[in-house]
UniProtKB/Swiss-Prot annotation:
Protein name: UPF0354 protein GWCH70_2742
Top-level taxon: Bacteria
Homology family: Belongs to the UPF0354 family.
InterPro entries: DUF1444
Length: 265
């Protein structure tokens, strides 16, 4: 299954007269837009293909459901008032757009050299990124939204799975609620994990549905983390970054891991 074939399969499943499809061969993406609203979603095809090799039709079913939910929701009018408990931060790569297709600035903060924090209104099966127009219409200021979002992400349950490889311990947060990567902003949780770690603490957010925390004891641990992060990055529906981060004194610093060597970016 290559990108062109996957593109055709998704188009066949989503065939509707009121939607348009644009395959970008260079970026390896498929954009689906509503003809009326001009709003839509962009799918990273390599991630879907990687999942297809493991899950076959289930991987396509998942992305089709995601697109249908997202585009159908775009016809609805959404408000922030009364929805305070549904506002969350989401982590995205620095290549992610900073404005909507209509040129409206999105609300975001710089996070690391590899990531940004955007703010979203949770809609159940999907979400809407908060933009400046939405804020102005409801007379909400940036700080109010950011404060609420940070509080809400700290309130999310955190279920951690553990795996050991060659003396190194890897912890995974993978609840698939759309905010696993966002839990990297839960500072009390990171501080709690830091107390458990006896080696070097590293973090990774390869895609939106996983947070990896590593207790690195030797060079093998760095190699395993790099391979693991790249694998998750390649298979994620919403990829973020294939780089990992050292966690020191509450700060995140991107690192390159090459073979048995690593260096700070």
């Amino acid at each position: 299954m290559d990108s062109k074939q996957m593109c055709e399969e998704i188009k066949k499943r989503l065939a509707r007269d009121d939607w348009t499809f644009q395959f970008d061969r260079k970026k390896d993406t498929l954009r689906i837009e509503d003809k009326e609203t001009k709003k839509g979603v962009t799918i990273s095809l390599p991630g879907v293909i990687a999942k297809w090799y493991e899950q076959k039709d289930e991987a396509v079913d998942e992305i089709v459901y995601y697109v249908e939910q997202a585009l159908n929701t775009m016809h609805e009018k959404h408000t922030l008032s009364g929805k305070e408990k549904d506002i969350y931060p989401v982590i995205r790569s620095t290549s992610f757009p900073t404005e909507t297709k209509e040129g409206i600035p999105l609300l975001y903060d710089e996070h690391t050299a590899e990531t940004r924090i955007y703010y979203a209104l949770d809609l159940g099966n999907t979400y809407r990124l908060i933009d400046k127009k939405m804020m102005e219409q409801e007379q909400w200021n940036e700080e109010r939204i950011k404060e609420i979002a940070r509080f809400n992400v700290r309130s999310l349950d955190v279920h951690v799975k553990e795996d050991k490889v060659a003396g190194n311990t890897f912890y995974f947060v993978n609840t698939n609620d759309g905010y696993d990567a966002s839990r990297i902003l839960n500072e009390p949780f990171l501080a709690k994990m830091k107390k458990k770690i006896t080696g070097t603490m590293a973090l990774a957010v390869p895609h939106q549905d996983v947070l990896i925390i590593a207790d690195l004891q030797n060079e093998v641990g760095y190699d395993v983390l790099a391979q693991m992060t790249m694998s998750f990055f390649a298979s994620g529906r919403v990829p973020i970054t294939a780089l990992s981060f050292l966690y020191e004194d509450g700060e995140l610093e991107p690192i390159f891991i090459l073979g048995k060597n690593y260096r700070k970016k």
